[in-house]
Every structure is written in C-alpha cells, then in structure tokens.
Amino acid sequence: MRKSLHGSNFVLLGLTLLLVSCLGTAHRTPEPKRVASIQPTQAPTAKTGNNVSPQATSSAQNTPVPTENTHSTQVSPGMTVTSSGLPNFGHIIIIVMENKEASQIVGNPDAPFLNELARDYAQAADYYAISHPSLPNYLALTGGDTFGITSDCHTCFVNADNIANQLAAAGKTWKAYMESMPGPCFVGDKLPDYSVNHDPFMYYDDIRTNPDLCNEVVPFSQFSIDLRADTLPDFVWITPNTCNDMHSCAISIGDSWLKTLVPEILASPAWKDNGVLFITFDEGVTQSGCCSFAAGGKVFTLVISPFGKAGYVSTASYDHYSLLRTIEASWNLPLLEKAGSKSTPLMSEFFAR
C-alpha cells in the first residue's frame, strides 16, 4: 500500500513538471509579425447623367498622376493625364460625316473600312446627335448649344463663345479644314460640294469678323500639306465635301474617302504622339436621344487613339456635348454651355485601362 502511494507520488510529480514546462513554452512563443498587405479594392463608380462609368484608381506602374487629381483614370504608360483624369492629348482630330443612323453603318458591307476601324479601336455604340437638321449639331459640337437655331440657315450668325476661341485664348493652335471650300475664310453660303451649314466656325461672330481667327478656316487641300510637313495644329477639324461626307452620295463613297485619309493620319507623328481621332456623324435619321438634351438620332462614333482601348464597344450613353466636354476637359478648358451640364457624361472610359 505504501509502495503504491509512493509510486503515485512520482507520477503526480511528473505530470506537474510536464504541465509547468508546457505553460512556460506557451508563454515564450512570440506573436507573429504583422505584415502590411495591399488588398485589391473595388473602384468606385461615378454616375453622370445616364452614364455610369467606373473610375479606375491610379497605379504606380502607370504614368504618374498629378497630385491634385483625386479622380484619376488609368491610362497607358507614356500618357500623362489632366485634372479631369483624361489624357493630355498632343493633338485632337475630328472628322464629321453626315446624315446616317448608326444602324446604317454597323455591319454594312458598303462601309467595310468604318467597320474595320470599329473592330480595331473603340466604338461609342450609344452616342446621339442633338437635333435636326445639320447646323444645330455642328454648333453643339463647337459651342455647347444650338443657340435656338432649328434650321440650316446660312446667315443666322451667333455671338457666343466657342471651342476655337477657347483654344486661341489658351495658346493652343487650331485649324478647320473644309473640303471644296474655295479659299480661307470663305463667307459664301453654298457651292456645288460645299455648304456653310457644315462649317460651324463661319457662324461665330468672333471668328468670322476676326481675320486672325477666320484665316484658320481653310480648304481641305491644306491638310495634306500640313500633315506631311508635320505642322498640324493642336486641334484639327475636318469636314468632307457634301459627297464624301455621305450627305449627297452613297455610303461606299464616304467610306472609301475615309479609307484614303485615315491611314495617313494614323501614320503621322501628330496621332502617334499622344493623339486622338474622333469620327462621328452630325445627325441620324430618327428622333432617338439620351442624356437630357439629345434627340437627333443614334450616330456611329469612333474613338481612335494609340492610348485608347482596342476592340472596345461602349454601351454607355453619350452625345455631341459629351465629345465637346471631353475635348475641353482634356486640355483644362472651361466647359461651354451644355458641355458643362451635370447630365453630360465625360468620355473617359475609352482611355481607361
């Protein structure tokens, strides 16, 4: 009995020592180190008018974003951005075609080149003209309003600010190239293939009456000279004549005209060096619209830039005021009229990566 108790004491002593050892080891175990980790975050969305587009967060791997820009959009390496989050374009080129609904162009075998561009670059598939007929849309694209004009009047001049005046004030160069226009600053109203209502710049008083500005509205023949000499201005507007813009001639004629012109633009330093080319139509053939102001039909619109998205189709709603807003915002210009409306969305998604 005593021997048994003695053995039991040794067992109890052993268990006690084992317990103390375990507690000591647990007490000495260091806490794991805290390692900072970067967790992927969901970018916030910004709603503007009828368009909800993601605002991408800036990345250290991309071009540095100005510190004052708190709503930046990621763009391709090599491209700087403005306070709006848009690329700071070196050159902006716009070509305006005529009088076709988007459905008349998309998939049309008579427009193979435009459809090829849509596959290779970016298309705004829900983009609308503002009104009917042509002239109000040209004014909307350049002045941010139709200014109460509802016809293709030839002498209904406008005393209003406009993109050309803004560019000149900001020290940027600009030129409007008008096919079949007989000479710079031509104030006549109509020729066989030229119509002034497709030339919005001649409607603005501060351009038409100022030789320094008016002489920047030139015949299209000057474009090839400037392109080959690498002297294109910062802002380029191109209006084809009334046949090549599809107004009076077949879609295939306008498509062929673009097939000759656009590759020359895309091969130029002006486009390759931070450039962007927009191709749109002044109006469609329906009353469809979006974004509070537009009711001029859905029109085929392309965004072509070496820093833009490729093979991209946007279903967000845009209109001519959106395009003007995008141009002005990319160069930190004041927003004209309805281009500054809260219901006018910015076309920044085409350059986000």
Predicted regions, residues:
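Bacterial N-terminal signal peptides that target proteins for export
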Residues: 2-11
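C-terminal motif of bacterial Sec signal peptides marking the signal peptidase cleavage site
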Residues: 19-21
